[in-house]
Amino acid sequence: SDRFIDLEKDEYIDLFEIEKNQRDLNLTAGRSVVCVDRKGDGNYGVYVANYGGPTRFYEYTDDIIVDKSVQLNLAKITGGRAVVAGHIISDKIDVFAANERGANFLYKNNNGKFLDVANEYRVQDILQNGRGTALADIYYRGRLDILNGNWGGFHRAYVLKDNIFEDIAKPPFDEPSRIRTVISADLDNDGYDEVFMNNIGEPNKLFKILDNGLIE
């Protein structure tokens, strides 16, 4: 199963090896994880994107690790690949999950539970196979947008316009590649974010997000 490592008395232990935490072990193929403060109170849970099995969402409850994915409306079965969390469409932490052989998920935080609104916001991208994803303020307007890399397909740069995400990606950024991971940050401290795209069997790519959403 997964491992949940904790430091106790200068010793690292796997909390899932403790019997009381073994009720909800994840016995499917995990692909990506993200920590989510779903209530905004400083307490984090762990969203686990699985391949061919239901999503998990682990939290500590009464000193026991419990999977709350069912009660939080997250227990979907898909080809999970990548996941990010942040203030995407609500004033709390939302979740975007990029999937393979199925639609992406965009979970809007609804008072600590989640509602998949990927179809309404046009980010399902059902014909593509998601691999790596990151959040970035593409227009430098103080809100998070979605960068999504698709395996052998067109990469996306989703920006929110009139309550719908529009893909503004253009060549060479959107050109298909055997992508594995996407990260975004101001790597050279010049005030503009970069996007690093990690590919397999071909060169990696590094882009810069300039003014007006230009990625080059």
Segments from the language model and where they lie:
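Beta-rich catalytic cores
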Residues: 29, 53, 79-81, 102, ...
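Short loop/turn segments that connect beta-strands within the blades of beta-propeller domains
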Residues: 1, 51-53, 61, 100-102, ...
